[in-house]
Amino acid sequence: MRILRLLAVLLIAPSLHAADWNAAVLAAVRSMPTGGGYSVTSETSARLRAATGVGADNLRISPAIARPSYCSGATYLVLLKALAGAQATGALQLDPATLQALAPAMQRDGQGAWGRWNANGPGTARLFHELGVGRNFTSWEAARPGDFLKIFWRDAVGSDERGHSVIFLGVENRDGVESVRFWSSNKPDGYGEKVVPKAKIARALFSRLEQPERFAGIARVPAVDPYLASLLERRSSFAEACAKSGVAVPR
Protein backbone atom coordinates (compact mmCIF):
# COMPACT_ATOMS: atom_id res chain seq x y z
CA MET A 1 0.00 0.00 0.00
CA ARG A 2 2.86 2.38 0.83
CA ILE A 3 4.35 1.75 -2.64
CA LEU A 4 1.01 2.52 -4.28
CA ARG A 5 0.75 5.79 -2.37
CA LEU A 6 4.29 6.70 -3.42
CA LEU A 7 3.51 5.96 -7.06
CA ALA A 8 0.42 8.14 -6.85
CA VAL A 9 2.46 11.03 -5.47
CA LEU A 10 5.07 10.64 -8.21
CA LEU A 11 2.39 10.61 -10.91
CA ILE A 12 0.64 13.68 -9.54
CA ALA A 13 3.75 15.71 -8.68
CA PRO A 14 4.65 16.92 -12.21
CA SER A 15 1.19 18.37 -12.81
CA LEU A 16 1.18 20.02 -9.40
CA HIS A 17 4.64 21.45 -10.07
CA ALA A 18 3.50 22.94 -13.38
CA ALA A 19 0.31 24.29 -11.83
CA ASP A 20 2.29 25.92 -9.03
CA TRP A 21 4.32 27.93 -11.51
CA ASN A 22 1.15 29.17 -13.18
CA ALA A 23 -0.03 30.17 -9.71
CA ALA A 24 3.28 31.97 -9.12
CA VAL A 25 2.82 33.90 -12.37
CA LEU A 26 -0.73 34.88 -11.38
CA ALA A 27 0.47 35.96 -7.92
CA ALA A 28 3.05 38.16 -9.63
CA VAL A 29 0.32 39.67 -11.82
CA ARG A 30 -1.76 40.48 -8.73
CA SER A 31 1.21 42.26 -7.16
CA MET A 32 1.74 44.54 -10.15
CA PRO A 33 0.56 48.18 -10.13
CA THR A 34 -2.25 49.35 -12.37
CA GLY A 35 -2.29 52.04 -15.03
CA GLY A 36 0.70 54.28 -15.57
CA GLY A 37 0.15 54.68 -19.29
CA TYR A 38 1.49 52.89 -22.35
CA SER A 39 4.56 54.11 -24.21
CA VAL A 40 7.31 52.64 -26.37
CA THR A 41 10.29 54.99 -26.08
CA SER A 42 13.92 54.82 -25.00
CA GLU A 43 12.91 56.50 -21.72
CA THR A 44 10.35 53.76 -21.08
CA SER A 45 13.04 51.13 -21.62
CA ALA A 46 15.36 52.99 -19.25
CA ARG A 47 12.62 52.93 -16.60
CA LEU A 48 12.24 49.17 -17.13
CA ARG A 49 15.95 48.67 -16.50
CA ALA A 50 15.82 50.92 -13.43
CA ALA A 51 12.94 48.85 -12.03
CA THR A 52 15.14 45.75 -11.73
CA GLY A 53 18.20 45.31 -9.56
CA VAL A 54 20.30 42.33 -8.53
CA GLY A 55 21.22 41.72 -4.91
CA ALA A 56 23.49 39.12 -3.39
CA ASP A 57 21.02 36.29 -3.88
CA ASN A 58 17.89 37.63 -5.56
CA LEU A 59 16.33 40.08 -7.97
CA ARG A 60 14.84 43.32 -6.67
CA ILE A 61 11.78 44.27 -8.70
CA SER A 62 10.12 47.70 -8.36
CA PRO A 63 7.48 47.74 -11.12
CA ALA A 64 6.07 51.11 -10.07
CA ILE A 65 9.28 52.64 -11.46
CA ALA A 66 8.56 51.09 -14.86
CA ARG A 67 5.71 53.46 -15.74
CA PRO A 68 4.76 54.17 -18.44
CA SER A 69 5.28 50.68 -19.81
CA TYR A 70 4.86 48.46 -22.84
CA CYS A 71 3.65 44.89 -23.25
CA SER A 72 6.84 42.84 -23.42
CA GLY A 73 8.37 44.79 -20.54
CA ALA A 74 5.26 44.20 -18.43
CA THR A 75 5.19 40.44 -18.98
CA TYR A 76 8.95 40.20 -18.43
CA LEU A 77 8.59 41.93 -15.06
CA VAL A 78 5.91 39.38 -14.16
CA LEU A 79 8.29 36.56 -15.06
CA LEU A 80 11.06 38.11 -12.94
CA LYS A 81 8.70 38.69 -10.00
CA ALA A 82 7.61 35.04 -10.14
CA LEU A 83 11.24 33.93 -10.16
CA ALA A 84 12.18 36.34 -7.35
CA GLY A 85 9.29 35.11 -5.21
CA ALA A 86 10.38 31.50 -5.63
CA GLN A 87 14.00 32.45 -4.98
CA ALA A 88 12.99 34.16 -1.72
CA THR A 89 11.24 31.03 -0.41
CA GLY A 90 13.99 28.65 -1.49
CA ALA A 91 11.81 26.98 -4.13
CA LEU A 92 14.29 28.21 -6.72
CA GLN A 93 18.04 28.71 -6.47
CA LEU A 94 19.59 30.72 -9.28
CA ASP A 95 23.12 32.03 -8.82
CA PRO A 96 24.00 35.76 -9.00
CA ALA A 97 25.44 35.44 -12.50
CA THR A 98 22.16 33.99 -13.78
CA LEU A 99 20.12 36.65 -12.02
CA GLN A 100 22.30 39.33 -13.60
CA ALA A 101 21.86 37.74 -17.03
CA LEU A 102 18.08 37.82 -16.59
CA ALA A 103 17.91 41.50 -15.62
CA PRO A 104 16.77 43.77 -18.48
CA ALA A 105 19.72 45.40 -20.22
CA MET A 106 20.42 47.48 -23.30
CA GLN A 107 20.11 44.53 -25.66
CA ARG A 108 19.00 44.47 -29.26
CA ASP A 109 16.31 42.05 -30.41
CA GLY A 110 17.49 38.47 -30.04
CA GLN A 111 20.38 39.33 -27.70
CA GLY A 112 20.50 37.81 -24.22
CA ALA A 113 17.41 36.88 -22.21
CA TRP A 114 15.63 40.23 -22.37
CA GLY A 115 16.53 40.80 -26.02
CA ARG A 116 15.00 37.45 -26.89
CA TRP A 117 11.83 38.15 -24.89
CA ASN A 118 11.43 41.59 -26.44
CA ALA A 119 11.96 40.47 -30.04
CA ASN A 120 9.39 40.30 -32.79
CA GLY A 121 7.86 36.91 -33.45
CA PRO A 122 8.05 34.09 -30.89
CA GLY A 123 10.43 35.80 -28.46
CA THR A 124 9.13 34.22 -25.26
CA ALA A 125 8.49 30.85 -26.88
CA ARG A 126 11.93 30.77 -28.46
CA LEU A 127 13.59 31.55 -25.10
CA PHE A 128 11.54 28.86 -23.32
CA HIS A 129 12.41 26.30 -26.00
CA GLU A 130 16.10 27.20 -26.12
CA LEU A 131 16.53 26.85 -22.34
CA GLY A 132 13.93 24.13 -21.76
CA VAL A 133 12.20 26.15 -19.03
CA GLY A 134 8.71 25.32 -20.28
CA ARG A 135 6.63 24.14 -23.18
CA ASN A 136 5.04 26.03 -26.03
CA PHE A 137 1.74 25.22 -27.73
CA THR A 138 -1.05 26.70 -29.83
CA SER A 139 -4.13 24.95 -28.40
CA TRP A 140 -6.71 27.20 -26.74
CA GLU A 141 -8.16 24.11 -25.07
CA ALA A 142 -4.83 23.36 -23.39
CA ALA A 143 -4.29 26.93 -22.15
CA ARG A 144 -4.53 27.76 -18.45
CA PRO A 145 -4.58 31.06 -16.57
CA GLY A 146 -0.98 32.08 -15.92
CA ASP A 147 0.35 30.96 -19.29
CA PHE A 148 2.37 33.50 -21.23
CA LEU A 149 0.78 34.29 -24.59
CA LYS A 150 1.99 36.01 -27.74
CA ILE A 151 -1.00 37.34 -29.65
CA PHE A 152 -0.69 37.98 -33.36
CA TRP A 153 -3.44 40.34 -34.47
CA ARG A 154 -2.91 39.34 -38.09
CA ASP A 155 -1.33 36.34 -39.79
CA ALA A 156 2.10 37.93 -40.06
CA VAL A 157 5.33 37.32 -38.14
CA GLY A 158 8.41 39.50 -38.22
CA SER A 159 8.93 42.94 -39.68
CA ASP A 160 5.27 43.45 -40.57
CA GLU A 161 3.62 41.78 -37.57
CA ARG A 162 1.21 43.31 -35.12
CA GLY A 163 1.61 41.48 -31.85
CA HIS A 164 0.97 41.69 -28.13
CA SER A 165 2.78 39.96 -25.23
CA VAL A 166 0.30 39.09 -22.46
CA ILE A 167 -0.52 36.81 -19.53
CA PHE A 168 -3.49 34.61 -20.43
CA LEU A 169 -6.33 34.73 -17.87
CA GLY A 170 -9.06 32.77 -19.63
CA VAL A 171 -11.75 32.56 -22.29
CA GLU A 172 -15.21 33.85 -21.42
CA ASN A 173 -18.53 34.70 -22.97
CA ARG A 174 -19.16 38.43 -23.04
CA ASP A 175 -22.56 39.46 -24.36
CA GLY A 176 -22.72 36.32 -26.46
CA VAL A 177 -19.22 36.82 -27.89
CA GLU A 178 -16.41 34.37 -27.14
CA SER A 179 -13.70 36.59 -25.68
CA VAL A 180 -10.18 36.34 -24.28
CA ARG A 181 -9.17 37.96 -21.00
CA PHE A 182 -5.51 38.79 -20.45
CA TRP A 183 -3.19 41.01 -18.43
CA SER A 184 -0.41 43.16 -19.88
CA SER A 185 0.50 46.76 -20.50
CA ASN A 186 -2.28 47.78 -22.86
CA LYS A 187 -2.94 50.92 -24.87
CA PRO A 188 -3.63 53.54 -23.62
CA ASP A 189 -3.81 52.91 -19.87
CA GLY A 190 -0.81 50.68 -19.18
CA TYR A 191 -0.83 47.84 -16.64
CA GLY A 192 -4.14 46.03 -16.32
CA GLU A 193 -6.58 43.46 -17.66
CA LYS A 194 -8.25 43.59 -21.04
CA VAL A 195 -10.90 41.51 -22.80
CA VAL A 196 -11.05 41.19 -26.59
CA PRO A 197 -13.18 39.07 -28.93
CA LYS A 198 -11.32 35.87 -29.69
CA ALA A 199 -12.13 36.35 -33.38
CA LYS A 200 -9.79 39.37 -33.43
CA ILE A 201 -6.80 37.14 -32.70
CA ALA A 202 -5.31 35.68 -35.88
CA ARG A 203 -2.72 33.46 -34.18
CA ALA A 204 -1.83 32.56 -30.59
CA LEU A 205 1.38 31.04 -29.22
CA PHE A 206 1.32 29.99 -25.55
CA SER A 207 4.32 29.39 -23.29
CA ARG A 208 4.01 27.67 -19.91
CA LEU A 209 6.69 28.07 -17.25
CA GLU A 210 7.52 24.62 -15.86
CA GLN A 211 11.24 24.31 -15.06
CA PRO A 212 12.57 27.77 -14.21
CA GLU A 213 15.72 26.30 -12.68
CA ARG A 214 16.87 25.82 -16.28
CA PHE A 215 17.29 29.57 -16.64
CA ALA A 216 20.71 28.75 -15.16
CA GLY A 217 21.65 27.71 -18.70
CA ILE A 218 21.36 31.26 -20.06
CA ALA A 219 25.16 31.63 -20.04
CA ARG A 220 25.51 28.62 -22.36
CA VAL A 221 23.24 29.77 -25.19
CA PRO A 222 24.56 31.90 -28.06
CA ALA A 223 24.81 35.59 -27.22
CA VAL A 224 22.39 36.38 -30.06
CA ASP A 225 19.57 34.32 -31.54
CA PRO A 226 19.99 34.96 -35.28
CA TYR A 227 16.39 34.05 -36.10
CA LEU A 228 14.89 36.53 -33.63
CA ALA A 229 17.46 39.18 -34.54
CA SER A 230 16.47 38.89 -38.20
CA LEU A 231 12.79 39.60 -37.55
CA LEU A 232 13.32 43.34 -37.29
CA GLU A 233 13.94 43.45 -41.02
CA ARG A 234 12.46 40.32 -42.55
CA ARG A 235 9.16 38.52 -42.68
CA SER A 236 8.76 35.08 -41.17
CA SER A 237 5.64 32.94 -40.89
CA PHE A 238 3.66 31.41 -38.05
CA ALA A 239 4.73 27.96 -39.23
CA GLU A 240 8.40 28.97 -39.00
CA ALA A 241 7.84 30.61 -35.61
CA CYS A 242 6.30 27.39 -34.31
CA ALA A 243 9.08 25.24 -35.74
CA LYS A 244 11.69 27.48 -34.07
CA SER A 245 9.79 27.09 -30.77
CA GLY A 246 9.45 23.31 -30.73
CA VAL A 247 5.76 23.37 -31.61
CA ALA A 248 4.13 21.12 -34.19
CA VAL A 249 3.15 23.33 -37.10
CA PRO A 250 -0.62 23.95 -36.95
CA ARG A 251 -2.68 23.28 -40.03
Language-model features: locations:
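Surface-exposed intrinsically disordered loops and tails
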Residues: 50-57, 125-137, 205, 221
